[in-house]
Curated annotation (Swiss-Prot):
It comes from the Bacteria. The keyword Repeat does not apply. SUPFAM superfamilies: S-adenosyl-L-methionine-dependent methyltransferases. S-adenosyl-L-methionine binds at residues 187, 215, 220, 236, 296. Its EC number is 2.1.1.-, 2.1.1.35. Signal peptide: none annotated. This is tRNA/tmRNA (uracil-C(5))-methyltransferase. The keyword Transmembrane helix does not apply. InterPro entries: MeTrfase_TrmA_AS (IPR030390), MeTrfase_TrmA_CS (IPR030391), SAM-dependent_MTases_sf (IPR029063), TrmA_MeTrfase (IPR011869), U5_MeTrfase_fam (IPR010280). It holds the Pfam family tRNA_U5-meth_tr. It catalyses: uridine(54) in tRNA + S-adenosyl-L-methionine = 5-methyluridine(54) in tRNA + S-adenosyl-L-homocysteine + H(+); uridine(341) in tmRNA + S-adenosyl-L-methionine = 5-methyluridine(341) in tmRNA + S-adenosyl-L-homocysteine + H(+). One of its GO terms (biological process) is tRNA methylation.
Length: 363
């Protein structure tokens, strides 16, 4: 993880630059002006990863980060203003604890995962085998800090407490509970994530047809969007994300979602009846009356075949972490769909990265 340049006084200008950049990328498609959703200026990041750096000539170690492209010049940290208050509260207490050799010996990396609800999980990574002595020390530390702990060494993983954190997010007046597993993707900026969920919920609107969701992850968007439609068919290929999504659906008593572990390409083959899939044996695809598709693809965007799948739908709700590939995908879809809404979500203040959303509707 590289270190963002933290400068709250520059926030407004940086956000305006992102807005102009997004508007410029979408201008060829006659997009409306983007709705802009700001981030808190500090303490917005719910997860953080630090290397440990040893001072030359002694055993003292520090949290360290690096500038982009420079892995040899550490920036030593005592706190981290962009990280959640919970992470900042835990950093010095964990640092004091690694003086115990059972916890600190050959510890080289620390990962924090927290939630708006106040839950926390710390992952400790080692260049040595961890054993029962580590577990005993970790159980004591977890109780003292009020956290869950995961220890990792080559070929071994020990969990103290839970291997996930519990989050609560509010969308349109309803609270949704989420399990967010250690090591799996979660949106880093909780406040902005909540705004994204609200925007997607509003943009989709109340429908009497069905929704197809690609790349559903742990069900971040699935839960609120399922309340807007008759049924949802959701796909995801990550096993840990699928398991988390299934648990989240059960925890929230959402019973109109079927989740299958298929790639977008495999689902396209299934919908085209090119080949059967055993994982779809209990799902009657012909029973769905899809009106909308929701996509939240990786940075590479949708491949051309997935774009052609999306083209079948009246409405395409697209959340993107890369505006360049978003624009490329829209260029492929523009002859059949127009942009009726777009939004900028400032998930990553003080960086050039941005999250954006568009609603495309059939012409």
């Amino acid at each position: 993880m590289s270190r963002p340049q933290f400068d709250p006084s520059a926030y407004a200008a940086q956000l305006e630059d992102k807005k102009s950049r997004l508007a410029g990328l979408l201008a060829p498609f006659a997009a409306p002006a983007p709705e802009v959703f700001e981030s808190p200026r500090e303490h917005y990041r719910l997860r953080a990863e630090f290397r440990l750096w040893r001072e030359t000539g002694n055993e003292k170690r520090h949290y360290a980060m690096f500038e982009q492209g420079d892995k040899h010049t550490p920036i030593l940290l005592e706190d981290f203003p962009i990280a959640s208050r919970r992470i900042n509260e835990l950093m010095p207490r964990l640092k004091a604890a690694w003086a115990d050799p059972a916890l600190g010996f050959k510890l080289f990396q620390v990962e924090f995962l927290t939630t708006l609800a106040g839950d926390a999980l710390i992952t400790l990574c080692y260049h040595r085998p961890i054993d029962d002595a580590w577990r005993q020390a970790a159980e004591k530390l977890a109780a003292e800090l009020g956290v869950n702990l995961v220890g990792r060494s080559r070929g071994k993983r020990i969990v103290v407490g839970r291997d996930y954190v519990e989050e609560e997010l509010s969308v349109a007046g309803r609270r949704f509970r989420y399990r967010q597993p250690e090591g799996a993707f979660t949106q880093p900026n909780g406040e902005v994530n909540q705004k994204m969920l609200g925007w997607a919920y509003e943009a989709l609107g109340q429908r009497d047809d069905d929704l197809l969701e690609l790349y559903c992850g742990n069900g971040n968007f699935t839960l609120p969007l399922a309340t807007r439609v008759r049924k949802v068919l959701a796909t995801e290929i990550s096993k840990s994300s699928v398991n988390a999504a299934l648990a989240n659906l059960a925890d929230n008593a959402v019973d109109n979602v079927s989740l299958v572990r298929l790639s977008a390409e495999e689902l396209t083959q299934a919908l085209n009846e090119v080949r059967p899939f055993r994982r779809l044996a209990d799902i009657d695809l012909k029973s769905y009356a899809f009106g909308s598709v929701f996509v939240d693809p990786p940075r590479a965007g949708m491949d051309p075949d997935t774009c052609e799948l999306a083209r079948r739908f009246e409405r395409i709700l697209y959340i993107s972490c890369n505006p360049e590939t978003l624009a490329q995908n829209i260029a492929q879809l523009h002859d059949t769909h127009r942009i009726s809404r777009c939004a900028l979500f400032d998930q990553f203040p003080y960086t050039h990265h941005m999250e954006s959303g568009v609603l495309l509707e059939r012409r």
